[in-house]
């Protein structure tokens, strides 16, 4: 992105969002609710017991079609399982809107652009979530 910062957050989550052909707004709603309420932040005793809502956290939402890369055959990933850009963009925007409706500050990258994304991963804690 030409060294321009287009999305940045403080404490919270970076969510890499992959969208496939049969994903729906119901899937986006389910995952938005799950992400903001999942108790994965430490409480005063160091136990994972607080949600993004509890800590007043933010989300950096990054569209990532490569999550649906299939590497079973050959030496180059096949991205046929990723939704086409027009569908993916609409559902990605809906996902971000649903998070904002829940009172979460959401920053995004630029959809479809090549970006350098930086992450400080405490723990590290990395989770894979799916609605199906």
Curated annotation (Swiss-Prot):
Q: Name one Pfam family in it.
A: Tyr_Deacylase
What InterPro entries does the annotation carry?
Daa-tRNA_deacyls_DTD, DTD-like_sf
Per the record, the GO terms for biological process are: D-amino acid catabolic process; tRNA metabolic process
Coiled coil located at which positions? none
Q: Name one GO molecular function term.
A: tRNA binding
GO cellular component entries: cytoplasm
Q: How is it used?
A: The dtd gene from B.amyloliquefaciens strain A50 confers the ability to grow in the presence of 20 mg/ml D-Tyr and 500 mg/ml D-Asp to B.subtilis, showing it can be used as a selective marker in bacteria that do not have a functional copy of this gene. Spontaneous resistance to D-Tyr is very rare, on the order of 10(-9).
Gene3D superfamilies per UniProt: D-tyrosyl-tRNA(Tyr) deacylase
Biological function: A non-functional D-aminoacyl-tRNA deacylase.
Any miscellaneous information on file?
Culture in the presence of D-Leu, D-Met, D-Trp or D-Tyr leads to growth inhibition due to their incorporation into protein, as well as inhibition of biofilm formation. Partially contradictory results are seen in another study where growth occurs in the presence of 20 and 500 mg/ml D-Trp but not in 500 mg/ml D-Asp or D-Ser; whether these are the exact same strains is unknown.
The record ties this protein, via HAMAP family, to: Deacylase_Dtd
Q: Which family does it belong to?
A: Belongs to the DTD family.
This protein's name? Inactive D-aminoacyl-tRNA deacylase
The organism is Bacillus subtilis (strain 168)
The lineage is: Bacteria, Bacillati, Bacillota, Bacilli, Bacillales
């Amino acid at each position: 992105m030409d060294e321009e910062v287009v999305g940045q957050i403080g404490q919270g989550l970076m969510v890499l969002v992959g969208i496939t052909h049969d994903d729906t707004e119901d899937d986006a709603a389910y995952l938005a609710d799950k992400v903001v309420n999942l108790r994965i932040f430490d409480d005063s005793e160091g136990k994972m017991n607080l949600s993004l809502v509890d800590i007043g956290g933010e989300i950096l939402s990054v569209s990532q079609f490569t999550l649906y890369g299939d590497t079973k055959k050959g030496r180059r990933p096949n991205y046929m399982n990723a939704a086409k850009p027009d569908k993916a963009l609409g559902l990605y925007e809906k996902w971000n809107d649903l998070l904002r409706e829940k009172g979460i500050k959401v920053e995004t990258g630029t959809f479809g652009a090549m970006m350098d994304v930086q992450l400080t991963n405490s723990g590290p804690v990395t989770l894979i979530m799916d609605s199906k």
